[in-house]
Amino acid sequence: DKTGKTERRTADSDLGGTMRLGGQTCILKKNSNVFKMYKKNKIIERHRHRYEVNPEFRDGFNTKGMNIVGTSVDDMLVEMIEIKNHPWFLGCQFHPEFTSNPRDGHPIFNSFISSTIKTKK
C-alpha cells in the first residue's frame, strides 16, 4: 500500500484475482511502427501479469515524447508505447516471447533484429 506495508491475501479479503492471463486483444494505431510490424490493426497477445499503466499518466506520456500506440479494445488499458522520432523503441505489457519460436519469429523480435542490422550498416 502507500505506506509501504505489504498486503497479504486472507480468506476474507478480495486481494488477488487481478491477473491478466492468456490472449488479450490489442488495437494498434495505424500511424505507428507496431502497425508496420504486424501489418494489421488488431492483434492478440499473451499476458501473464498484474500490472497496468496508471491512466492518469496517459496525457503525460504524449506530452513528454511517448506515443501510446496499442490499447485494449475498450481503450482503458495501455498495451504498447513508442518514443516519438526514435528509430526503434517499444514498450509492451504482454510477453512476445510466449508466441515466438526459431522458425517463426515474433513480429517485434523480427523488427528489432532488422532495425539493428540497418543501424549497424
Residue ranges with predicted function:
Residues 1-121:
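Amide-donor transfer/coupling interface in amidating biosynthetic enzymes
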